[in-house]
Amino acid sequence: VRAKKYNSYTNTGSGTSVKNILNRDFSTSRINQKWTTDVTEFKVCGRRIYLSGIMDMHSKEIIAYSLSFTPNMKLIMNMIKMAFRKMRNPKGVIIHSDQGWHYRHKSYKGFLKKKKAIQSMSRKGNCLDNAVIENFWGILKTEWFYLNKFDSIESFLEQLESYIHYFNYERDSSVLCYRTPIEVRYTNMIA
């Protein structure tokens, strides 16, 4: 059982990068203002599993995620479509990512444009520009992945779903004034 840093830049035939609008300004005043997304890789039972996730920078909620045995466009598009459905198609949200080929692909860029989202990308090879989601990957792997053994892919998937539910609904954080991501989201929706 091993987690590995996934390098998504390798497919250079996919579109161009966009400006780093976020420029490490992770501050927010409300939900659906800034989202951050990335892909990470796990090795479980001799198979690679790719996890694409998207987080609201205000609530720190994992809004949506998808899994695949291959790092393809379906992985990314399933995740981003799920996020927009769940959050009721917010307009003007800044969506920040690294410069991975998925995020430079015309189908991803076209979807964001159709949804009136603003795309932002980290500088090439600079993980600190996407520190919010990178920090979550570290928490996920430290608190859950490295502490568990998985006797099957199914076991991994079930436990991952449970951990993300725990992270969103039960795990409070000092950054959120000791509230959970879901508490922050619902407080914001009422305000």
Predicted regions and their residues:
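Basic, flexible linker segments flanking DNA-binding modules
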Residues: 1-30, 126, 180-188
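RNase H-like two-metal-ion nuclease catalytic core shared by retroviral integrases
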Residues: 9-13, 97-99, 105-106, 121-141, ...
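Hydrophobic (often cysteine-bearing) scaffold residues that line and stabilize catalytic clefts
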Residues: 14, 18, 32, 51, ...
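Mobile genetic element proteins and their domesticated derivatives, centered on retroelements
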Residues: 22, 38, 54, 60, ...
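An active-site-proximal beta-strand-loop segment
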Residues: 24, 28-63, 69-71
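Short small-residue beta-strand/loop micro-motif enriched in glycine and branched aliphatics
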Residues: 61-65, 119-122, 146-147
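Active-site beta-loop-alpha junctions of metal-dependent nucleic acid enzymes
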Residues: 66-88, 94
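C-terminal domain-tail junction helix/linker
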Residues: 106, 113-117, 139-191
